């Protein structure tokens, strides 16, 4: 059973060989048809062979309010320092210009070398590697190493990495007890958020608030937390799934690949000799690769925001998972399934399309904040759907999805607005076909994204520009008021106030009693 305790040298060597063999076996299980289907999409990711030309210089700003001219430095990356705008003032009482950027639409708070996106060309690369190549040839654990340390591992490095993750895949019994104490119908994402936060309590050795703020300067300490979280994430997720199903948690296996082990914990029913379908495990592994990282999205930004305070990594990632729990971020594929179910049949698509154009219906799974082209992850996922259906049976909603995509991409309304399928459009169909309930979809997003969160956490610790994140605001409230006693106040009729707070019948029963 994997634990955080050391094994004997002979067992260590034996286990490394075992996990390496499992890794190589899993990598070879991808059917030729899947490899060939992905091959065509690798070309599009290579369209921009050379990096964009970098030109630095100065920007001249003329302030028409005062007639003054200002020179602002422009970096090679095409950025200016927001603090340079503070010198643009109208007088001694003016504190300078601020950038008002709701949602950070055009604000870059970090420099990062982890992932690259070109939304116009539909390109996504991890550390320079096209996502299509990694999905075709790599494994999730190998990609996690790439994201973390900047290069693909050697064979021996991969064996050490897989062993470290496996070594830390078991969770403390106290954490299992916490999960088991939650309501039987607790949402799996709520369980995951709570469990990630609770890990901080079980590992005080990893808390800078308890061990000193320089704790994470130690590479050994950092690496241990990385292995802990990547190792424990699927175990916690499996416990949440089994709690929802009314079944006891299952200990992880040390003889399976990362994705196989996850499916084993879900499906073994205590049978230690059980092995998941290798093709389904490979599909899940590819999905994990596709969801592992996506630069400064909402939840990754939350992780870096929290980490900037020096908080422990478990709390930082708990906040990130909490952000992912939001339906605008991690729950879109569930909305796609609901939409496709409501459409029902291919014959209803024209009416639905017109409803979208008339703003009477909402199309989920199309469009992206970054991509103004076909999401490269969606191309891969669409092909994976056929692989899953060949094993578990075809989902009739796939015909609706394919026809809806075709109709939208041939309609000027969507083409003009650059609305293309995103990563969520087909992923929900795959997860449903594999037997996952909709409430578990976001958990399947969170497990692999731990690698991206941790890569950004690690990068932020080494970045000399990292500061505690403290954005400015534009104040729009009352300028100055003085305190008036309650009995003398005149509250405007249209003033905001506390609304009616509902009282349960149980509370009404209690309040109707005496002695209260």
UniProtKB/Swiss-Prot annotation:
Q: What pathway is this protein a component of?
A: Carbohydrate metabolism; glyoxylate cycle; isocitrate from oxaloacetate: step 1/2
Q: What GO terms fall under cellular component here?
A: glyoxysome; mitochondrial matrix
UniProt subcellular location? Glyoxysome
Q: What are the record keywords, sorted?
A: Glyoxylate bypass, Glyoxysome, Peroxisome, Transferase, Transit peptide, Tricarboxylic acid cycle
Chemical reaction(s) catalysed: oxaloacetate + acetyl-CoA + H2O = citrate + CoA + H(+)
Q: Which GO terms describe its biological process?
A: glyoxylate cycle; tricarboxylic acid cycle
Task: State one Pfam family annotation.
Answer: Citrate_synt
- Please tell me what else the database record remarks about this protein: Citrate synthase is found in nearly all cells capable of oxidative metabolism.
TM spans (from-to):
none
Protein name in the entry: Citrate synthase, glyoxysomal
**Which principal EC class is assigned to this enzyme?**
transferase
Major subcellular location class? other
Active-site residues, Swiss-Prot/TrEMBL: 329, 368, 424
Q: Where is the transit peptide?
A: 1-43
Annotated GO molecular function terms are:
citrate (Si)-synthase activity
Query: What Enzyme Commission number(s) does the record list for this chain?
Result: 2.3.3.16
User: What family does the entry list?
Assistant: Belongs to the citrate synthase family.
């Amino acid at each position: 059973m994997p634990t955080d305790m050391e094994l004997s040298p002979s067992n260590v060597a034996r286990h490394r060989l075992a996990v390496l063999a499992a890794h190589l076996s899993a990598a070879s299980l991808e059917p030729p048809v899947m490899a060939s289907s992905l091959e065509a999409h690798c070309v599009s990711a290579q369209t921009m062979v050379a990096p964009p030309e970098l030109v630095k210089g100065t920007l001249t700003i003329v302030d028409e309010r005062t007639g003054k001219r200002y020179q602002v430095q422009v970096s090679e990356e095409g950025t200016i320092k927001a603090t340079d705008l503070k010198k643009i003032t109208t007088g001694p009482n003016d504190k300078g210009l601020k950038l008002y950027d709701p949602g950070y639409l055009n604000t870059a708070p970090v420099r990062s070398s982890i992932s690259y996106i070109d939304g116009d060309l539909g390109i996504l690369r991890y550390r320079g590697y096209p996502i299509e190549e990694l999905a075709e040839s790599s494994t999730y654990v190998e990609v996690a190493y790439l994201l973390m340390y900047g290069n693909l591992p050697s064979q021996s490095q991969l064996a050490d990495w897989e062993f470290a993750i496996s070594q830390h895949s078991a969770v403390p019994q106290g954490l299992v007890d916490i999960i088991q104490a939650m309501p039987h119908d607790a949402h799996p994402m709520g369980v995951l958020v709570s469990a990630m936060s609770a890990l901080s309590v079980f590992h005080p050795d990893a808390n800078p608030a308890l061990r000193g703020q320089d704790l994470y300067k130690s590479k050994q300490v950092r690496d241990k937390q990385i292995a802990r979280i990547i190792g424990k994430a699927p175990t916690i997720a499996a416990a949440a799934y089994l709690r929802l199903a009314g079944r006891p948690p299952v200990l992880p296996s040390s003889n399976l690949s990362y994705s196989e082990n996850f499916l084993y914990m879900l499906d073994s029913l205590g049978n230690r000799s059980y092995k998941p379908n290798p093709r389904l495990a490979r599909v899940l592994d590819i999905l994990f690769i596709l969801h592992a990282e996506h630069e400064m999205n909402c939840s990754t930004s939350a992780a870096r925001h929290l980490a900037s305070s020096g908080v422990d990594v478990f709390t930082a990632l708990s906040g990130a998972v909490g952000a992912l729990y939001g339906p605008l971020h991690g729950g879109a594929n569930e909305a796609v399934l609901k939409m496709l179910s409501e459409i029902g049949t291919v014959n209803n698509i024209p009416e639905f399309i017109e409803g979208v154009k008339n703003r009477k219906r909402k199309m989920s799974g199309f469009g992206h904040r970054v991509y103004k082209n076909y999401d490269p992850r969606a191309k891969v996922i669409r092909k994976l759907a056929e692989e899953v259906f060949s094993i578990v049976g075809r989902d009739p909603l796939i015909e609706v999805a394919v026809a809806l995509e075709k109709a939208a991409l041939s309609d000027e309304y969507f083409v003009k607005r650059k609305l293309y399928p995103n990563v969520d459009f087909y992923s929900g169909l795959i997860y449903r076909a594999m037997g996952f309930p909709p409430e578990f979809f976001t958990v399947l997003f969170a497990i692999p994204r731990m690698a991206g969160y941790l890569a950004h956490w690690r990068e932020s610790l080494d970045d000399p520009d990292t500061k505690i994140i403290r954005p400015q605001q534009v104040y729009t409230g009352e300028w100055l008021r003085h305190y008036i006693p309650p009995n003398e106040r005149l509250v405007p009729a249209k003033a905001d106030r506390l609304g009616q707070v509902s009282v349960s019948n149980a509370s009404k029963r209690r309040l109707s009693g005496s002695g209260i």
